């Protein structure tokens, strides 16, 4: 949540910052602000609202100076208003900073600072940091020393970008449990919450680790430990994807573009893991205590992974929400445990916390991640990348299907290593996986029909999504997509659960979306669909079997695909349906209310 962009160089800082903030909008925000200035005067402008309107209202692009920082805020402490927007400053106005994260001990620090005469303007935990640095500066030889002293008193998560009026040639940035990446240019330096913010200018990046801070000038950088002040040598990575890959490319929304990018993304996921998948499978083959941890859409991918591991590798994993893992499994993790953490961003706070606990207790940790160099990859013992490329829309689409692709590859390879499935079947499944991008292309051909269907459904108040077996996670994901961008209540569940309560909610015209590929539970699903139909529900079926039209009001005819691969293909029409319903209801599917792309606070 929230976004940071910092710049120091020869360009007009405000222009770099406003562009960067626009490219961080997908992270979600309710207010924004900018500070620039080369000398002793720092120009701070901020307010509640969208960046475009604030730029016009406050004149962001009129701000002078070649050094500056910008911020988009998602309120955690203090309501979203002009005063609580970032940047925040100290009593003197010389220390100005922006912050992502949550300071857990801000109340006690604020009380101490109030007693020492500090005057606070906002209700934020962020302002406490500025005043704390100001206080430490009184007994320090220089600003860096004061900064380190202050940082060592903070508890919680924080990514910071700081300018100090008396040091006009420096920009300070800090990372602790909240993402921050440096961009290394020629005669200029950048810092941001995510690479797209500065990718127009450089593809050379340094990923800060927790407990590190950096001092940037236009020509140099140094990274140090917060606790000791020791210099840390950091590798410079080159980002392979381009800014154009992160732009809309003619689509009305990023989400639709990313839905249509799935055939290519799935191919990249397959080709990107061919060489490494065998060695990973061999390394995890002997673990019987396996726990998947994830949140949101990644959690649904984990549920599919569980089915694949059971059906192919004859393993019986547990799937746990990362937010609950620490409280339920703390005493159950040991060196005989394999934890598979799935996170698109590699920065999801709950998932990182679960990974750290697992490592602390001696478990082997495998991360399935999209973002190269993210914190999850640095915690994990093993990493499989999904190679989806940048995903800007808040609602996960191509990152989900590439997660499923990688988990399918891993389950197949694990079954080969363990000899738990016939070689002929595994070879057939691999061949069919190679054809999945073509099957997704076929699924995308339903786009216009689904838009027309959405026209008839846009005023519905409730939806139910049902599936059985490996299709249950697809039902859950379809429901999540619908509610997060269309704001229609939706419930995903096992079709067998209908008669245990939800059936009472079905009445004339309530849409029930049934996911029913050919497979061992097909006939059972037909019975469940008939139960819903008898209560007056409007049945929308996804299936490769034409006979399902007998019990369906709408049949979305799907291509034939092995049941174990069906989650990758069958989720695509559900993404499109959710997208069209959101647009028809006047919502921006790229920026759903109250949500953020990367949830970096717990």
Swiss-Prot record:
Q: Where is the Glutamine amidotransferase type-2 domain?
A: 2-219
Tell me the InterPro entries matching this sequence.
GATase_2_dom, GFAT, GFAT_N, GlmS/AgaS_SIS, GlmS/FrlB_SIS, Ntn_hydrolases_N, SIS_dom, SIS_dom_sf
Could you tell me where this protein is found in the cell? Answer: Cytoplasm
Disulfide-bonded cysteine pairs: these are none
A GO BP entry: carbohydrate metabolic process
Checking Gene3D superfamilies in the record gives: Glucose-6-phosphate isomerase like protein, domain 1, Glutamine Phosphoribosylpyrophosphate, subunit 1, domain 1
Keywords (A to Z) from UniProt: Aminotransferase, Cytoplasm, Glutamine amidotransferase, Repeat, Transferase
GO MF annotations, alphabetized? carbohydrate derivative binding; glutamine-fructose-6-phosphate transaminase (isomerizing) activity
Please verify whether the record's keywords include Cytoplasm.
Answer: yes
Q: Enzyme group, top EC level?
A: transferase
Q: What is its main location?
A: cytoplasm
Its cellular-component GO annotations read: cytoplasm
The record's section on Pfam families has: GATase_6 (PF13522), SIS (PF01380)
Give the active-site positions.
2 (nucleophile), 597 (for fru-6p isomerization activity)
Q: What is its EC number?
A: 2.6.1.16
Q: Which residues form the SIS domain?
A: 280-420, 453-592
What's the catalysed reaction? Answer: D-fructose 6-phosphate + L-glutamine = D-glucosamine 6-phosphate + L-glutamate
Q: PANTHER family attached here?
A: GLUCOSAMINE--FRUCTOSE-6-PHOSPHATE AMINOTRANSFERASE, ISOMERIZING (PTHR10937), GLUTAMINE--FRUCTOSE-6-PHOSPHATE TRANSAMINASE (ISOMERIZING) (PTHR10937:SF0)
According to the record's subunit comment, the protein's assembly and interactions are: Homodimer.
Q: What does this protein do?
A: Catalyzes the first step in hexosamine metabolism, converting fructose-6P into glucosamine-6P using glutamine as a nitrogen source.
Q: Please give the name of this protein.
A: Glutamine--fructose-6-phosphate aminotransferase [isomerizing]
Upper taxonomic lineage: Archaea, Methanobacteriati, Methanobacteriota, Thermococci, Thermococcales
What's the encoding gene here?
glmS
């Amino acid at each position: 949540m929230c976004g940071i962009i910092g710049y120091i160089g020869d360009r007009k800082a405000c222009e770099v910052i406003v562009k960067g903030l626009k490219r961080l909008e997908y992270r979600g925000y309710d207010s924004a602000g900018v500070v620039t200035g080369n000398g002793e005067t720092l120009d701070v402008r901020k307010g509640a609202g969208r960046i475009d309107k604030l730029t016009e209202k406050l004149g962001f692009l009129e701000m002078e100076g070649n050094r500056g920082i910008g911020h988009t805020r998602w309120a955690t402490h203090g309501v979203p208003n002009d005063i609580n927007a970032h940047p925040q400053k100290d009593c003197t106005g010389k220390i100005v900073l922006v912050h992502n994260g949550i300071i857990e001990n801000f109340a006690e620090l604020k009380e101490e600072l109030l007693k020492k005469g500090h005057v606070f303007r906002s209700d934020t935990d962020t302002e406490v940091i500025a005043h704390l640095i100001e206080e430490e500066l009184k007994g320090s030889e220089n600003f860096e020393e004061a900064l380190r002293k202050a940082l060592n008193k903070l508890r919680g998560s924080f990514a910071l970008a700081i300018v100090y009026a008396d040091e006009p040639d420096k920009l300070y940035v800090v990372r602790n449990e909240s993402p921050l990446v440096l961009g290394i240019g020629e005669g200029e330096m950048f810092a941001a919450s995510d690479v797209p913010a500065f990718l127009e200018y450089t593809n050379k990046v340094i990923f800060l680790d927790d407990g590190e801070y950096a001092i940037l000038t236009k020509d140099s950088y140094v990274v140090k430990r917060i606790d000791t002040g020791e210099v840390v040598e950091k590798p410079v990575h080159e980002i392979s994807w381009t800014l154009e890959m992160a732009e809309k490319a003619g689509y009305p929304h990023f989400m639709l573009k990313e839905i249509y990018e799935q055939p290519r993304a799935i191919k990249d996921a397959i080709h990107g893991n061919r060489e490494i998948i065998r060695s990973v499978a061999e390394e995890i083959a002997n673990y019987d205590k396996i726990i998947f941890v994830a949140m949101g859409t990644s959690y649904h991918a984990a549920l599919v992974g569980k089915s694949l591991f059971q059906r192919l590798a004859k393993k019986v994993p547990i799937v746990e929400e990362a937010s609950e893992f620490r409280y339920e499994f703390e005493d159950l993790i040991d060196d005989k445990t394999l934890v598979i953490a799935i996170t698109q961003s590699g920065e999801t706070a709950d998932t990182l916390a679960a990974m750290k606990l697992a490592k602390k207790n001696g478990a082997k940790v495998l991360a399935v991640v999209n973002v190269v160099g993210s914190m999850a990859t640095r915690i994990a013992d093993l990493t499989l990348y999904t190679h989806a490329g940048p995903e800007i829309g808040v609602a996960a689409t191509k990152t989900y299907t590439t997660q499923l692709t990688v988990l399918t590859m891993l389950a197949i390879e694990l079954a080969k290593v363990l000899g738990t499935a016939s070689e002929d079947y595994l070879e057939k499944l691999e061949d069919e996986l190679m054809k999945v991008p073509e099957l997704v292309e076929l699924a995308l051909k339903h786009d216009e029909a689904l838009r027309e269907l959405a026209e008839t459904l846009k005023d519905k108040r409730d939806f139910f999504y049902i599936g059985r077996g490996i299709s249950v996670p697809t039902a859950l994901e379809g429901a999540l997509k619908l509610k997060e961008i269309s704001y229609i209540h939706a419930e995903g569940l096992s079709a067998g659960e209908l008669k245990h309560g939800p059936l009472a909610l079905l009445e004339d015209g309530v849409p029930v979306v049934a996911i029913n590929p050919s497979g061992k539970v097909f006939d059972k699903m037909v019975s469940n669909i008939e139960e819903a139909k008898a209560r007056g529900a409007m049945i929308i079926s996804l299936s490769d079997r034409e006979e399902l039209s007998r019990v369906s009001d709408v049949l979305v005819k799907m291509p034939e695909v092995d049941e174990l691969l069906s989650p990758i293909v069958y989720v695509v029409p559900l993404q499109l349906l959710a997208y069209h319903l959101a647009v028809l209801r006047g919502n921006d599917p790229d920026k759903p209310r109250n949500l953020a792309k990367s949830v970096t606070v717990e």
